[in-house]
């Protein structure tokens, strides 16, 4: 009997507007080293030997995508114009759109469009450490700063012990059918791991590093540029 080897597919939800960047252009298209911000992580995903296809979930009204040349990334890259109003909506819409291409036990890696500093080793480590995991997991880094819990007036109520606290990153990697069912049941989930948690399961944390940052504010764009420019030097 032939053993079935699960494949890996990436989904990048990119239907958001990035309002905290205070720009008229969607955040994923802001220029970074001469390319759209999203280009950099797509290039790494498309070049990953273990990733079969990379699906980018875009807004139905996205007119910016076609203004750029993505052909250099090769045939793995597939745009899907079916994005929803939230991250969870977009990921679920993407999963439904490609349901015929992905087997139930295949792995799906969901990556933030606004994390341009993804490196090949991030993907390799995630896939390696989760290969035999029954649930899946996500890249994350231990919380380094002291955390405070406050009230609505920003008065400190308590200091939160940071032991065993982690900051979630992406990619987040789960089995296709498990992820789809979890998102269908938890439509308000802020990330895939929280949807899996809501289903009563326990994702595994795979330690990453601070270079895999999410561009949220204008200063983050400069930091991402520095990381990409100095990577490997």
From Swiss-Prot:
Q: Name the keywords, alphabetized.
A: Isoprene biosynthesis, Nucleotidyltransferase, Transferase
List the GO molecular function terms: 2-C-methyl-D-erythritol 4-phosphate cytidylyltransferase activity
Q: Which domain of life is it from?
A: Bacteria
Q: What's an example GO BP annotation here?
A: isopentenyl diphosphate biosynthetic process, methylerythritol 4-phosphate pathway
Question: Pathway, per UniProt?
Answer: Isoprenoid biosynthesis; isopentenyl diphosphate biosynthesis via DXP pathway; isopentenyl diphosphate from 1-deoxy-D-xylulose 5-phosphate: step 2/6
Q: What is its EC number?
A: 2.7.7.60
Give a yes or no for keyword Transferase in this entry.
yes
Q: Which reaction does it catalyse?
A: 2-C-methyl-D-erythritol 4-phosphate + CTP + H(+) = 4-CDP-2-C-methyl-D-erythritol + diphosphate
Site entry (Transition state stabilizer), positions: 20, 27
Location of site Positions MEP for the nucleophilic attack?
162, 214
Stored InterPro entries? IspD, IspD/TarI, IspD/TarI_cytidylyltransf_bact, ISPD_synthase_CS, Nucleotide-diphossugar_trans
Q: What does this protein do?
A: Catalyzes the formation of 4-diphosphocytidyl-2-C-methyl-D-erythritol from CTP and 2-C-methyl-D-erythritol 4-phosphate (MEP).
PANTHER family linked to this entry: 2-C-METHYL-D-ERYTHRITOL 4-PHOSPHATE CYTIDYLYLTRANSFERASE, CHLOROPLASTIC
Q: Name the family the entry cites.
A: Belongs to the IspD/TarI cytidylyltransferase family. IspD subfamily.
Q: Which HAMAP family match?
A: IspD (MF_00108)
Tell me the protein's name: 2-C-methyl-D-erythritol 4-phosphate cytidylyltransferase
Q: Which organism is it from?
A: Aromatoleum aromaticum (strain DSM 19018 / LMG 30748 / EbN1) (Azoarcus sp. (strain EbN1))
Q: Which gene encodes it?
A: ispD
